[in-house]
């Protein structure tokens, strides 16, 4: 089975890829996983039937066009398409529904699932405390234990304070420089992450959707005329 992952950035890509591979392995399904990171989240275009702007590079800006292309090439084949991103300051339920609606419209012949981490992908990493501690044995366990799972609290900043000695300096620097560190944390922590042990509600929503799709990758959408 083929799994294609569209992610908003490189740090999210490695986490989702490794977790998807481990979930599939636990379910006894052999998969080939391809990951396609983008430059940020962006927003769904007002005219989703139009070609994207020439220099568009964010996930949602390109999503309708990419869904059309995937449906043309892979429609009806043994494939799962994962759309993975952070909810940031959006309402997770509303954003998830918008993405599923877009997928049903432009890729009705492909089984698509949404991996939406609450606020940021670091919520999924913080959902596996053992993985954080294994990756960074000298981490601040007091800060780790005080984190309220999947709360909107500046999640990457929490992880930064858990694992970095110069956290406040890094937080002050912020974007775009922090992107390098976020990718490093994701690469390191995801090596140790175990799907069955993760307590993040948003991760477990994704996990159950993927398990369901692995058992029956038939598209759940009926063709409709828009």
Provide a role label for each language-model segment.
Residues 8-9:
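Helix N-cap/beta->alpha junction signal
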Residues 5:
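Conserved SAM-binding loop
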Residues 2, 13-226:
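C-terminal accessory helical subdomains adjacent to catalytic cores in phosphodiester-
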């Amino acid at each position: 089975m083929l799994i294609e992952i569209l992610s908003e950035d490189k740090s999210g890509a490695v986490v989702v890829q490794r977790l998807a591979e481990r979930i599939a392995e636990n379910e006894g399904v052999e998969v080939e996983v391809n990951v396609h990171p983008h430059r940020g989240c962006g927003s769904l275009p007002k005219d989703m039937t139009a070609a994207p702007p020439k220099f568009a590079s964010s996930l949602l800006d390109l999503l309708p066009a990419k869904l059309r292309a995937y449906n043309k090439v892979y429609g009806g084949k043994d494939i799962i398409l994962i759309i993975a991103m952070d909810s940031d300051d959006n309402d997770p339920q509303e954003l998830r529904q918008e993405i599923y609606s877009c997928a049903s419209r432009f890729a009705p012949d492909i089984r698509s699932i949404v991996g939406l981490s609450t606020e940021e992908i670091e919520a999924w990493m913080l959902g596996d405390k053992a993985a954080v501690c294994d990756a960074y044995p000298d981490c601040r366990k007091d800060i780790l234990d005080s984190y309220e799972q999947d709360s909107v609290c500046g999640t990457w900043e929490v992880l930064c304070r858990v694992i970095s000695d110069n956290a406040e300096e890094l937080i002050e620097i912020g974007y775009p420089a922090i992107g390098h560190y976020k990718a490093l944390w994701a690469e390191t922590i995801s090596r140790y992450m175990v799907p069955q042990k993760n307590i993040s509600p948003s991760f477990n929503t994704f996990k159950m959707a993927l398990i369901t799709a692995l058992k029956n990758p038939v598209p759940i959408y009926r063709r409709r005329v828009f």
